[in-house]
From Swiss-Prot:
It comes from Shouchella clausii (strain KSM-K16). GO terms for biological process: DNA-templated transcription elongation; regulation of DNA-templated transcription elongation. InterPro entries: GreA/GreB_C_sf, TF_GreA/GreB_CS, Tscrpt_elong_fac_GreA, Tscrpt_elong_fac_GreA/B, Tscrpt_elong_fac_GreA/B_C, Tscrpt_elong_fac_GreA/B_fam, Tscrpt_elong_fac_GreA/B_N, Tscrpt_elong_fac_GreA/B_N_sf. Residues 48-75 form a coiled coil. The keyword DNA-binding applies. The keyword Protein biosynthesis does not apply. The gene is greA. This is Transcription elongation factor GreA.
Length: 158
């Protein structure tokens, strides 16, 4: 059997996944089963859009449950205490300055399971994170983005 992919995450990220899994199993799954029962009571399933919709929801919920269980089972916890605080690594927050315009941005590098660009959490697999990992304060880094190359300077790591 092929080795399953490891999912790097913080304790906070793992907790969020566990909470979502708990909700899906204890609440959402039951809601969908009830919708299926109600839709079945309408009779003929061949032209029953409520039934079809509920079955689609069930497939989505069960798929997400399986996905979350796998991610949690293969979680590798990021422990910042064991990492040099002066080096960009998983779990670290990095403040950057785009060059030459001077615009500042801040990102936390997390595992792909908990990445959320809208919250400033970028996946360790992203081009930005790949360019930053292992670098230190004052390093200048060229990042390949979909919009072209971008140069940044690392201002702070925490």
């Amino acid at each position: 059997m092929a080795e399953e992919k490891k999912h790097y995450m913080t304790a906070e990220g793992k907790k969020k996944l566990e909470e979502e899994l708990h909700y899906l199993i204890t609440t959402r799954r039951k809601e969908v089963v009830e919708r299926i029962k109600v839709a079945r009571s309408f009779g003929d399933l061949s032209e029953n859009s409520e039934y079809d919709s509920a079955k689609e929801d069930q497939a989505f919920v069960e798929g997400r449950i399986a996905q979350l269980e796998k991610m949690i089972r293969n979680a590798v916890m990021i422990e910042n205490e064991k990492v040099d605080g002066n080096v960009v690594s998983l779990g670290k927050t990095v403040r950057l300055m785009e060059l030459p315009d001077g615009e500042e941005e801040e990102y936390t590098i997390v595992g792909s399971a908990e990445s959320d660009p809208f919250e400033g959490k970028i996946s360790n697999d992203s081009p930005m994170a790949q360019s930053l990992l292992g670098k230190t304060v004052n390093d200048r880094v060229v990042v390949n983005t979909p919009g072209g190359e971008m140069e940044v300077e690392i201002l702070e790591i925490r």
